[in-house]
From Swiss-Prot:
Topology of this chain in the membrane: Single-pass type II membrane protein
Example of a GO biological process term: proteolysis
Species assigned in the record: Caenorhabditis elegans
Biological role: Removes N-terminal dipeptides sequentially from polypeptides. Essential for control of distal tip cell migration.
EC number: 3.4.14.-
Family assignment from sequence similarity: Belongs to the peptidase S9B family. DPPIV subfamily.
Enzyme class: hydrolase
Name of this protein: Dipeptidyl peptidase family member 1
Taxonomy of the source species: Eukaryota, Metazoa, Ecdysozoa, Nematoda, Chromadorea
Active site: 669, 742, 774
Sorted UniProt keywords: Aminopeptidase, Cell membrane, Disulfide bond, Glycoprotein, Hydrolase, Membrane, Protease, Serine protease, Signal-anchor, Transmembrane, Transmembrane helix
Residues with glycosylation annotation: 64, 138, 267, 335, 481, 512
Membrane-spanning ranges: 32-52
Length: 799
């Protein structure tokens, strides 16, 4: 029973007893003293245990869980209309921006995914269908298409018109699928040119000419083991980043689609637990792990809308008997003809083959082969943005420069099956991350690059008219507060929408790519100004950011980003505060990017009055292959060393501000693996505590595609196993958190770790989340609360 309850009980007894007249001043004084002591204790507790859900606390701002959503930029997926207006997705639904003013054109209902047709006459609404076992491969949805009629009266306020629509039920809705409202759809794709579409149901692709038309055309013949138009788990997670495996041609008259055979791929089994269900539900899905003998095999087909015929393509690779991943698919105009380009890579992802596919012959002829130098690899990012101009293709390859090599734009002139060597654009020493496209009138190519600094992401242009000189021009550099930019272009590459993610409040600019102002800078203006959002970010009191480059060896530097609560940084007398090292450390990751970063670590640090340190060392991206290659074949080694070295330097440089006796490390997924590895490799008691969420404990337990990309054909003995060296956890407190339904990093990893910690007699904290996957997204509040309580105990209570 609490102290407050005890006090109230006693107080009630005094009021109701027969001896109230016998109370003297001493008794009253004692009661008052007790009450005052309780009030002091409550006040002290409020100061010490900063509430997670209070907006402000005693004069200084504290971030809370709700800020994770309210401070997130509310706009995404921008697209141009025919009259140069801009359509975008927002929390509320689909909005259109005209002359700097936005209005809602289609509202979001119950969090449904909304996809507009090419002319925005129709909107597809996708609501998730029941999935009792929560199987990631069984995710389906109910699909409705709404006829979004033209405005009834342009003079009416939009909200009034929306109310009228609801009352009059003026919008016509169409249920899509073989069984209409009873159908569960696996994937859906509008034609980018017209209002027709395709969808996948029961592993087969179907075509419908318009929402109003009842007739369906079956495009493919998938079944129980052959799946058409969809990617399996490993392709969705590690290569394409999406579920559908369908590509409409630009003209809208052909559809390319991928198919795979899954009956030989091994399954992983997870369990879900439901109230009043006597038995758990088993969830089985295909997940080939490292060293797996069988990987999913994919084929590529084209369906012709005019003839209503499908043809499986004969992909002519030199080593056709070996296993190949499908890496990229894109329709491109080559010499005035639209053709399908497909890119393939070997199992270890260090060789690529590019083919051009023809409908008439049903052949994909080999046009380009490339073998990567030692300790280098290909990713989907290098070819997903492939583009063309006349008879030349442009994509990303490593370009050797002095003592380094950078991912840069390579051009390949096609020669009908005669293999040629690509040439590189004349660029500086920086990594190009993606190609946006080419303005064919001005012969200008646009791309994103990690420049002018490695921690930046900027939009560049480059003139193909004179490739003898470096004509690269940074477009987004002239936009204020835009060190981390993401751009979307119109079809003619004359206008760009640039989403600026930092370093301050995110915002969006619209850029005229064909005109320069008086300072020879590209003309730009705000797409829209969301004053409410801007004020919210400014009032949030985001931490002060310190960025440094520190030496960790003769050949390598580490980039660091130190975040300090603003009220602490501005104090006259600095008192050393705890430090939370937020680590990820995975291949090609950038943790010190100059963007506004507001994650759960910011909320926890705010509640704990601690600083956050992020570090990029060897293995990180943005600084060429010299850094990327360093971890090849040895995950969990040099990147761990660099983190520990950098922490030591930072603690020395900022010893007036950071308390070296109160250092915690926190990481999720690969970061969870890094957290455990760093505690193992650091000096004893270097870390006071550690939080590891959903960690990999040995990459032999992880998926083959990811692991073998970075480990190659290294034997099992070369794999780091964090469970082999756990003695430091006897002096470093550990909080281990994992979802039991994690389909990405299986709980198997934590189970093996738990077993070994118990064998060694290590005391640790454990929090498991039933029915929760890798992100624990529906348990964010609980995760933050548990982490905050754990770290506050570590920093302020434990000795």
């Amino acid at each position: 029973m609490t102290a407050e309850a005890d006090l109230l009980e006693g107080y009630d007894e005094e009021l109701g007893g027969n001896e109230s007249q016998k109370r003297d001043c001493k008794g009253i004084t004692t009661a008052i003293v007790v009450v005052l002591l309780i009030l002091v204790m409550i006040f002290a507790a409020l100061v010490f245990f900063t509430p997670l859900f209070a907006a402000k606390s005693f004069g200084s701002w504290r971030l809370n869980v709700s800020d994770l959503r309210s401070l997130r930029y509310p706009y995404a997926e921008f697209a141009f209309t025919d009259n140069n207006a801009v359509v975008m997705q927002s929390w509320e639904g689909v909005e259109i921006v005209e002359d700097g003013v936005s209005r809602l054109i289609f509202g979001r209902e119950n969090g449904a995914e909304i996809t507009p047709s090419a002319d925005r006459k129709y909107f597809a609404m996708m609501d998730h269908a029941p999935n009792p076992g929560m199987n990631p491969q069984n995710e389906t949805f109910h699909l409705k298409i709404v006829n979004n009629n033209e405005r009834l009266n342009p003079l009416l306020p939009f909200e009034v018109e929306e109310l009228f629509r609801e009352l009059s039920d003026s919008r016509i809705t169409y249920d899509i699928g073989l069984r209409k409202e009873e159908s569960v759809i696996q994937a859906f794709k509008w034609n980018g040119k017209f209002n027709d579409f395709v969808f996948v149901e029961s592993n087969k692709i179907y075509y419908q000419s318009s929402p109003e038309e009842e007739g369906l055309t079956r495009v493919s013949n998938g079944g129980e083991h052959t799946v058409d138009g969809l990617f399996d788990w490993i392709y969705e997670e590690e290569i394409f980043g999406r579920k559908d495996a369908m590509w409409w041609s630009t003209k809208g008259d052909q559809l390319a689609y991928a198919s795979y055979d899954n009956h030989l791929t091994k399954n992983v089994s997870l369990k879900t637990y439901h109230r009043l269900e006597p038995y758990p539900i088993d969830t089985n899905f295909h997940y080939p792990k490292t060293f797996a003998k069988v990987l999913p095999t994919y084929t590529l087909s084209i369906w012709n809308k005019k003839t209503e015929q499908s043809r499986q393509l004969d992909v002519q690779l030199k080593d056709s008997l070996s296993y190949h991943y499908l890496l990229a698919v894109k329709w491109l105009e080559i010499n005035g003809t639209e053709q399908l380009v497909s890119v393939w890579t070997n199992r270890y992802q260090n060789e690529v083959a590019l083919t051009i596919c023809d409908w008439d012959t049903a052949i994909c002829r080999l046009e380009f082969e490339y073998k990567y130098a030692s300790k280098r690899w290909v990713t989907h990012d290098d070819f997903h943005s492939i583009t063309s101009f006349e008879d030349t293709l442009f994509f990303l390859l490593p370009h050797d420069k002095r003592d380094n090599a950078f991912q840069q734009v390579a051009s390949l002139r096609l020669s009908h099956g005669q293999l040629r060597t690509p040439k590189f654009l004349n660029l500086g020493e920086y990594d190009v991350t993606s190609i946006n496209g080419i303005n064919k009138e001005t012969r200008t190519i646009f791309f994103h690059a990690a420049a002018p600094k490695p921690s930046h992401r900027s939009l560049f242009s480059y003139s193909l008219a004179d490739e003898s000189r470096n004509s690269a021009y940074c477009i987004s550099c002239s936009i204020k507060n835009c060190t981390w930019a993401q751009a979307q272009m119109d079809d003619q590459m004359k206008t760009a929408i640039v989403s600026c993610k930092g370093p301050a409040a995110p915002h969006t600019a619209i850029v005229n790519l064909t005109r320069m102002d008086s300072d020879k800078k590209t003309e730009h203006a705000n797409l829209l100004y969301d004053k409410t959002y801007q004020n919210r970010v400014e009032e949030a009191g985001l931490p002060v950011i310190i960025k440094e480059t520190i030496k960790i060896s003769d050949d390598f530097d580490a980039l660091i980003k130190l975040s300090i609560p603003k009220d602490i940084y501005n104090r006259d007398k600095h008192q050393a505060i705890p430090l939370i090292v937020h680590v990820y450390g995975g291949p090609n990751d950038q943790n010190t990017k100059e963007a506004t970063q507001i994650g759960i670590e910011e909320v926890v640090a705010s509640a704990s009055q601690a600083a956050i340190l992020r570090i990029d060392g060897r293995g990180s991206g943005g600084r060429g292959w010299k850094y990327r290659s360093a971890i090849y074949g040895q995950l969990g080694t040099v990147e761990v060393e660099d983190q520990i070295k950098a922490i030591k330097v930072v603690l020395r440089l900022y010893r007036h501000l950071l308390d070296a006796r109160r250092v915690a490390v926190f990481g999720w997924s690969y970061g969870g693996f890094m957290t455990l590895s760093m505690v193992n490799e650091a000096p004893e008691q270097f870390f006071k505590c550690a939080v590891s969420v959903a960690p990999v404990t040995n990459f032999a337990y992880y998926d083959a595609t990811y692991t073998e990309r970075y480990m190659g054909d290294a034997p099992l003995e070369s794999y780091s196993d964090v469970t082999k060296k756990l003695d430091n956890f006897k002096s470093t407190r550990l909080l281990l958190m994992h979802g039991l339904l994690d389909d990405n990093v299986h709980f198997q990893n934590s189970a093996i770790l738990i077993d070994e910690l118990q064998n060694r007699g290590v005391d640790f904290d454990l929090m498991v989340y039933p029915n929760q996957a890798h992100s624990l997204s529906s348990r964010t509040s609980h995760v933050v609360g548990k982490m905050t309580h754990f770290l506050r105990q570590c920093f302020y209570t434990d000795k």
